[in-house]
Amino acid sequence: MYLEQIKGELQEAADVLAKFMADEKNIQLIQEAALLIANSFKQGGKVLSCGNGGSHCDAMHFAEELTGRYRENRPAYPAIAISDVSHLSCVSNDFGYEYVFSRYIEAVGQTGDVLFGLSTSGNSKNVLNAINIAKEKGMKVIALTGKDGGQMAGLADVEIRVPHFRYADRTQEIHIKVIHILMMLIEFEMAKTA
């Protein structure tokens, strides 16, 4: 009944991944992002992650694997997904949804911390505001984007961009793969100093 549609979806996902992998720059950027985060941890910093919708879930996933574990038992790493419902509803109501992440960064972000922002379009105003505040506070910024990078293009210290222009789910599929690879590399790097 739907076998061809299923095969088509899987093939498109494989094609998007193959295109992403074919650009050696993407491989280098993943390594650069992992080392940036590990170096922040080694210096007493933390990661603050944010995104909207599915990207919000990915931001939470990243933080929980840092504070919990990925593949191996090891010490917990300092990470916070900006996802506290009372904070989000308060700031949305009092200031506007475009400030839900930047207000949190303003409150707890410090020099040497890392902002990990996700936006499949690169145009999420609340993530853009978070990037601007993070930079003002001397934080490093890693952005996972899609399409042409949108307004986030060129703003982050490390931008990992999925060059896919159709549906956000394909971009999110690569983002979660990148997150898992980052986790693996961070654990490798942190184990060197354990």
Curated annotation (Swiss-Prot):
Record-annotated SIS domain positions: 37-194
InterPro entries reported in the protein's UniProt record: GmhA/DiaA (IPR035461), Phosphoheptose_Isoase (IPR004515), SIS_dom (IPR001347), SIS_dom_sf (IPR046348), SIS_GmhA/DiaA_subfam (IPR050099)
UniProt-annotated location(s): Cytoplasm
Origin superkingdom: Bacteria
Keyword Cytoplasm: yes
Single GO MF annotation: carbohydrate derivative binding
Pathway the protein takes part in: Carbohydrate biosynthesis; D-glycero-D-manno-heptose 7-phosphate biosynthesis; D-glycero-alpha-D-manno-heptose 7-phosphate and D-glycero-beta-D-manno-heptose 7-phosphate from sedoheptulose 7-phosphate: step 1/1; Bacterial outer membrane biogenesis; LOS core biosynthesis
Chain sites annotated for binding substrate: N52, G53, G54, E65, N93, D94, S119, T120, S121, S124, Q172
Cofactor: Zn(2+)
Catalyzed chemical reaction(s): 2 D-sedoheptulose 7-phosphate = D-glycero-alpha-D-manno-heptose 7-phosphate + D-glycero-beta-D-manno-heptose 7-phosphate
Top EC category: isomerase
Function: Catalyzes the isomerization of sedoheptulose 7-phosphate in D-glycero-D-manno-heptose 7-phosphate.
The family this protein is said to belong to: Belongs to the SIS family. GmhA subfamily.
Additional facts recorded: The reaction produces a racemic mixture of D-glycero-alpha-D-manno-heptose 7-phosphate and D-glycero-beta-D-manno-heptose 7-phosphate.
PANTHER family documented for this protein: PHOSPHOHEPTOSE ISOMERASE, SEDOHEPTULOSE 7-PHOSPHATE ISOMERASE / DNAA INITIATOR-ASSOCIATING FACTOR FOR REPLICATION INITIATION
Protein name, per record: Phosphoheptose isomerase
Gene assigned in the entry: gmhA
